């Protein structure tokens, strides 16, 4: 069983995908850089959660 992602993580990832979807791909490392560049998240843990969820959405 995995961890449940918060609404903030899901909403932020979806918004970033809508605004900057062409910059994201199925590579987690690339998505971490994109999230760091285009969002104002304060912690590395939160950045990684958002990048992971964005990667998950793209792989579906």
Curated annotation (Swiss-Prot):
UniProt entry keywords in alphabetical sequence: Ribonucleoprotein, Ribosomal protein
Designated gene of the protein: rps17e
NCBIfam families to which the protein is assigned, alphabetical: PRK01151.1
Database matches in InterPro entries: Ribosomal_eS17, Ribosomal_eS17_CS, Ribosomal_eS17_sf
Gene Ontology MF annotations: structural constituent of ribosome
SUPFAM superfamilies tied to this protein: Rps17e-like (SSF116820)
GO cellular component: cytosol; ribonucleoprotein complex; ribosome
Family classification: Belongs to the eukaryotic ribosomal protein eS17 family.
Biological process terms in GO annotation: translation
Protein name listed in UniProt: Small ribosomal subunit protein eS17
């Amino acid at each position: 069983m995995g961890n449940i992602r918060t609404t903030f993580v899901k909403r932020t990832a979806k918004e970033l995908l809508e605004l900057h979807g062409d910059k994201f791909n199925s590579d987690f490392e690339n998505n971490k850089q994109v999230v760091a560049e285009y969002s104002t998240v304060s912690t590395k843990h939160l950045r990684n959660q958002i990048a992971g969820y964005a990667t998950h959405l793209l792989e579906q």
